[in-house]
């Protein structure tokens, strides 16, 4: 859907470009290396049954194309919540995806029964009373969440099996994912909610010397929480864009501050804020790094 200032929203996607319906569990937005945002959508992936998985839609100015497979983020089981975050203040965004559906006996997979059921007449498939008994069956349970680290050039690698990271070792049924800096030190942490289980809180224990900057934005003419605000930070050889949508994702709410990892850059060339009201505001480029700043929309 595309924003139409006169009529609200209009259907902007070309029906001829549709790639078919999928499971669509959660959506997340990020500017990876473009002036346009990319949209990551979690789906249900199961090898030999549902082989397509997550999608990463990138806009080229005319239409969106799926780069989920090219970037290595399409396979992560029965996906739910997902969030982009900067794992080391390098300015490069990585991605965490929670997964898992029903944890039963690992030796009793319900997927085969679902595959057999799908070949039955539509009247049987659409009526749950004809479905095989699910008691004790496993439907994408015991899956491990995915930690996709962006190693540059937007190529992501799943590090969830790295024993040192201790990612979802209990293989709980992941649901919501939120990003927050609860220590206010520029190190973004993750909290993950799990169905029928305890929540996870992941934090970086080995801080590096990369610089960062963060902003708490307050709207005046715009909404007070500045939801929908867009910020651009220009460094000597790089421009970074963030938008504030803390409510994105499945059953989660993230830190309402915008965070920028700056890598080894020790100064900022330019800072522009594009408020939801339509107003553009420029900040002084000599602003202090490695702290959060509160910025109020100019009247």
Q: Where in this protein do the model-derived segments appear?
A:
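Surface-exposed loop/turn motifs at beta-strand-loop junctions within extracellular Ig-like
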Residues: 43, 99, 274-277
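Short, solvent-exposed beta-strand-terminating loops
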Residues: 98-116
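Short glycine/acidic-enriched loop and turn motifs that connect beta-strands
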Residues: 45-48, 102-104, 197-198
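Generic beta-strand/beta-sheet core signal
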Residues: 3, 30, 42, 57-59, ...
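Acidic/hydrophobic-patterned starts of short beta strands in beta-sheet-rich repeat architectures
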Residues: 34-42, 89-98, 184-193
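Blade-edge motifs of beta-propeller repeat domains
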Residues: 1-22, 47, 53-77, 113-172, ...
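Gly/Ser/Thr/Pro-enriched helix-cap/hinge segments flanking short amphipathic alpha-helices
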Residues: 137-146, 150-299
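Beta-propeller blade termini
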Residues: 15-16, 23-35, 80-89, 174-183
């Amino acid at each position: 859907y595309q924003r139409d200032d006169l009529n609200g929203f209009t259907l902007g996607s070309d029906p001829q470009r549709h790639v078919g319906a999928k499971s669509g569990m959660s959506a997340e937005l990020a500017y990876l290396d473009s002036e346009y945002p990319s949209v990551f959508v979690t789906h249900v992936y199961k090898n030999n049954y549902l082989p397509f998985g997550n999608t990463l839609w990138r806009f080229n100015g005319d239409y969106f194309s799926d780069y989920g497979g090219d970037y290595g983020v399409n396979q992560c089981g029965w996906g739910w919540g997902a969030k982009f975050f900067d794992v080391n203040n390098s300015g490069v965004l990585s991605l965490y995806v929670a997964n898992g559906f029903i944890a039963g006996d690992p030796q009793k997979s319900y997927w085969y029964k679902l595959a057999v059921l799908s070949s039955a007449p539509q009247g049987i498939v659409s009526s749950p009373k004809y479905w095989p008994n699910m008691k004790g069956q496993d439907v994408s349970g015991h899956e491990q969440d995915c930690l996709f680290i962006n190693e540059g050039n937007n190529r992501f690698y799943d590090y969830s099996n790295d024993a040192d990271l201790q990612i979802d070792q209990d293989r709980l049924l992941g649901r919501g994912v939120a990003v927050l800096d609860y220590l206010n030190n520029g190190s973004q942490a993750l909290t993950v909610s799990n169905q029928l289980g305890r929540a996870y809180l992941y934090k970086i224990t080995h801080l590096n010397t990369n610089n960062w900057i963060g902003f708490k934005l307050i709207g005046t003419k715009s909404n007070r929480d500045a939801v929908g605000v867009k910020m651009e930070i220009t460094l000597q050889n790089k421009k970074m864009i963030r938008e504030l949508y803390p409510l994105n994702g499945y059953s989660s709410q993230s830190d309402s501050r915008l965070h920028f990892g700056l890598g080894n850059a020790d100064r900022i060339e330019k800072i522009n804020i594009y408020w939801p009201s339509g107003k553009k505001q420029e900040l002084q480029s000599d602003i202090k790094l490695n702290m959060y700043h509160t910025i109020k929309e100019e009247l």
